[in-house]
Amino acid sequence: MADIYPWQQALWSQLGGRAQHAHAYLLYGPAGIGKRALAEHWAAQLLCQRPAAAGACGECKACQLLAAGTHPDYFVLEPEEAEKPIRVDQVRDLVGFVVQTAQLGGRKVVLLEPAEAMNVNAANALLKSLEEPSGDTVLLLISHQPSRLLPTIKSRCVQQACPLPGAAASLEWLARALPDEPAEALEELLALSGGSPLTAQRLHGQGVREQRAQVVEGVKKLLKQQIAASPLAESWNSVPLPLLFDWFCDWTLGILRYQLTHDEEGLGLADMRKVIQYLGDKSGQAKVLAMQDWLLQQRQKVLNKANLNRVLLLEALLVQWASLPGPG
């Protein structure tokens, strides 16, 4: 079982010290802040035969079984493949587990992540377990996007917000996790991850700073008419679509903010500030607003794993982006 992260200590002191437990909890917050580690730590305490406020004892039979991955009263439900939905028959297996008697005579614990990966049928199948608790069972649901959950799911859980850690705590942790990276690089990684330290660590492993430099260089060449949309779109094959749409949404928002305030502060990372200012001065606000609306719609499709033609989607994005300067 994972240890909790330093920024979770205050939250754990609330959760771990409870004498009575609800049937279901929803831990929600941004991705990359350690909600899974917190849920696993809590699950271990709930299953432990000699629990303390700090967590599980780590020595009893239940803790030993959990460490070995063979605890009969612990059920983890997650997509069978990364980025795939949780299927209804997986949830039916969970329901079957919930109605069974605990084999060790204590409570049963279910960990489900991410809850938004359930489609409507899977979520409806889960509702029965949420509506009709069976024995001493605790369900721990984790969500990175709670707005995508059915209201009936959320209403049957005790909802616990897991906030983004402060920048100082995140940078301190990143400095230990990535000791070879200079402070400036860590700050850039944290900014690129939206302030989520675990996401920053993951993106570092994917070469996000190099990907960002490639994309920024391409955007500048596009605006200077040194490259066309089609070859540029193809050259970005290694850059994840969610990252691309996050960046373009941020840049478009920066353009709008600059048009309204002419404030050069708050325009994001230095690599795109001059481009944002240029587009803010040269683009019609209605055109920028239309671009932002389109980006947000497409970003949602990307996040929902819609079946999209990647190159055509990026070509459409780049054609619109290149047309921003000018009347309209």
From Swiss-Prot:
Keywords: DNA replication, DNA-directed DNA polymerase, Nucleotidyltransferase, Transferase. It comes from Pseudomonas aeruginosa (strain ATCC 15692 / DSM 22644 / CIP 104116 / JCM 14847 / LMG 12228 / 1C / PRS 101 / PAO1). DNA polymerase III contains a core (composed of alpha, epsilon and theta chains) that associates with a tau subunit. This core dimerizes to form the POLIII' complex. PolIII' associates with the gamma complex (composed of gamma, delta, delta', psi and chi chains) and with the beta chain to form the complete DNA polymerase III complex. This is DNA polymerase III subunit delta'. GO terms for biological process: DNA-templated DNA replication. Gene3D superfamilies: 1.20.272.10, P-loop containing nucleotide triphosphate hydrolases (3.40.50.300). It is an enzyme of class 2 (transferase). DNA polymerase III is a complex, multichain enzyme responsible for most of the replicative synthesis in bacteria. This DNA polymerase also exhibits 3' to 5' exonuclease activity. The lineage of its organism: Bacteria, Pseudomonadati, Pseudomonadota, Gammaproteobacteria, Pseudomonadales. Its EC number is 2.7.7.7. The keyword Mitochondrion does not apply. One of its GO terms (cellular component) is DNA polymerase III complex. It catalyses: DNA(n) + a 2'-deoxyribonucleoside 5'-triphosphate = DNA(n+1) + diphosphate. One of its GO terms (molecular function) is 3'-5' exonuclease activity.
